[in-house]
Amino acid sequence: MRDKAGYMGVEIPISKIKELREQSGAGIMACRNALLETEGNMEKATEILRERSLFLVQKKAERSTTQGIIEAYIHTGGKIGAMVEVNCESDFVARTDEFKELAHHLAMQVAAINPQFVSREEIPEGTDIEPEQVCLLLQPDIKDPTKTIQDIINETIAKVGENIKISRFARFELGS
């Protein structure tokens, strides 16, 4: 017998759906359906959700981002600081904890790694610069080096359902 989603009688425990939701940030039904499609295989379900969220991110990429916040971070000792302007589509999302945490994380990244540009497109033509070293979006994340900053932003886009962009940032270091 098939359920409403058209799947044969595979029982997916609520605990497994909850675990996948916590890992991915995806909605309950998306997690349930991914687990049903993979007959409960967490790794395959995670990959399905990742592919779907990337598709959604690409669909949202052209949307206007006129709301957002400016986040500041001062490193312990007060000798290094950073500010970052992160934009989204609505003030509702700008007030969410997920968005605020992302902005804070990005400010910490700027303070720690000192990027020069937001994206590859900002690098002047003809310069011999390694984009992964100087572009914030291409840098490995300070908390999880297996992901880039763009990956972290994409995950947040999938969670909040809106386009997110970094407009600009500044880094300050005492004595420089």
Question: Whereabouts are the PLM-identified features?
Answer:
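N-terminal assembly/interaction segments in proteins that build large macromolecular machines
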Residues: 2-176
